[in-house]
């Protein structure tokens, strides 16, 4: 006899706790723990180009120095407008390392919408996809870092993008854009940097970590600030809710 969905749900009652532990560290601690426990495990897979947790942490620490040398300090806001790419991951955790606030922007949002969001959070440094850089003018921001999202692809794919054929040009134009004078290459800056000093203070769990922007379905998108503890609790909720996860052995597909 087929059991009802309610009867099946009863089997799960003991699997998910009624209370979830509240984290006592910053979000950077999550990455640092993963790099310490699983240094050689693959953290990112981007079109077949893989990066281990240890390599990602090294990139994050280099990027943290780049931001700090650009004038970003604890409590400052950094605008990030990137699609899913390794640089987006690194930029976010670089902010988390130095206690900056990562303001996540839709890279396809119109310039008028971005102007309002920049005005609300007051960030003076932006890390943006080349295709949307025009929405982040230097007369509003002190520093604009541009990101080539093809940079993290395997060398063979980047070589194909440079072929003088129509299909390669079309794909290249979808991925890359014209970079205005006065901007800086995020990829070159982070590659030539050195890791930030280990003595640089970590943020506290109650410091602001992220500003997320709502969809604006009912009007102008709102800016929602969240602390390290807010996001950390959400991470713990996901870990306990998806209760059959095996630590260090799962793969997540991001769209």
How would you name each of these model-derived features?
Residues 78, 99, 216-217:
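Conserved G/P- and acidic residue-centered "switch" motifs that form tight phosphate/ATP-binding loops
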Residues 42, 76, 100, 206-207, ...:
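Surface-exposed loop/turn positions
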Residues 1-24:
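Flexible, non-catalytic linker and terminal segments flanking ANL/adenylate-forming cores
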Residues 69-70, 97-188:
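Structural core segment of the AMP-binding/adenylate-forming
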Residues 22-23, 32, 42-85, 89-93, ...:
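Conserved AMP-binding/adenylate-forming core of the ANL superfamily
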Residues 24, 28, 172-205:
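Alpha-helix-centered segments that form part of catalytic cores
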Residues 94-98, 250-251:
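Conserved short alpha-helical elements in the N-terminal third of ANL/AMP-binding
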Residues 67-72, 193-206, 211-254:
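Conserved adenylate-forming
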